[in-house]
Amino acid sequence: MSCSCGSSCGCGSNCKCGKMYPDLDEQASTTTQAVVVVGVAHENKAGQFEMASGEGCKCGANCKCDPCNC
């Protein structure tokens, strides 16, 4: 079994890696919706915002977050 964390590593109440929002697991919907967003966004300057990169959440044994301090 492979363990891929990277930007998809997130800690929740179950402290699991590999899914962005582990607390929302298995909440599938049977309806299909499409959203179209049309517009112009402002220029994003990375220096003005904190960028999330899964800090403090790394894959350990059995694809669990190590340490779980998110």
Curated annotation (Swiss-Prot):
Query: Which InterPro entries does its entry note?
Result: Metalthion_15p
User: Where would one find coiled-coil regions in this protein?
Assistant: none
Q: Is Metal-binding one of the keywords UniProt gives this record?
A: yes
- MF terms per GO, please? metal ion binding
- Keyword annotations from UniProtKB, A to Z: Metal-binding, Metal-thiolate cluster
Query: In which domain of life is the source organism classified?
Result: Eukaryota
Family the entry assigns = Belongs to the metallothionein superfamily. Type 15 family.
**What does the protein in this record do?**
Metallothioneins have a high content of cysteine residues that bind various heavy metals.
Tell me the protein's name: Metallothionein-like protein 1
Gene name in the database record: MT1
